[in-house]
Amino acid sequence: IYSEDFVDRLAAGEWTFEIPSGKKIDNEVDAAVQLYNLYIVAPALGMDFSQYFTPEEANWFAMLLDAEDYVQKGPGFVGSDISHRNSRPLLDDFFASIDRQSAEHPDGSATLRFAHAETLIPFEALIKAPGSQTQITASDLDFWKATDWRGASQGRMAANVQWDVFANDQGQQVVRMLSLIHISE
């Protein structure tokens, strides 16, 4: 899909491109990452990009994007919560909604929220949901061996975090949380 001349000019620094998001493509690796981004959405587009990546290359790029999402949105590095502390207001609102719904609708109700992976991934890290519990150190160079976090599971389409609230006759409540991110289609 990329000509040899195109790749050589990128590698030599002769060409750079800016994509609509504002990111720059400065070299052949940046161009390959953009091609891989097409590869991972290609099935939804009805296209086959497998001719451009061997399974080993696809796994390497998957790990690269997983590591980026893990550090930027997920559990991140040991001793730091910067990647997911912004989810705290959402967690606080979950609890406030439970209190409000219980008071206003004691016989039952529901609060539904719909969000993208950019919201769900940090939230799962904050509550230490399965797959989002392990933080890594800067010396953990093999990301996939250091953690079980995988973007294909944690940030998947139709992921779900469900809280069911049950109350006994005395009004004591218990919350059951179901994290449905590892369901198979």
Language model: regions and residue ranges:
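Signature for phosphate-centric chemistry
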Residues: 1-111, 115-184
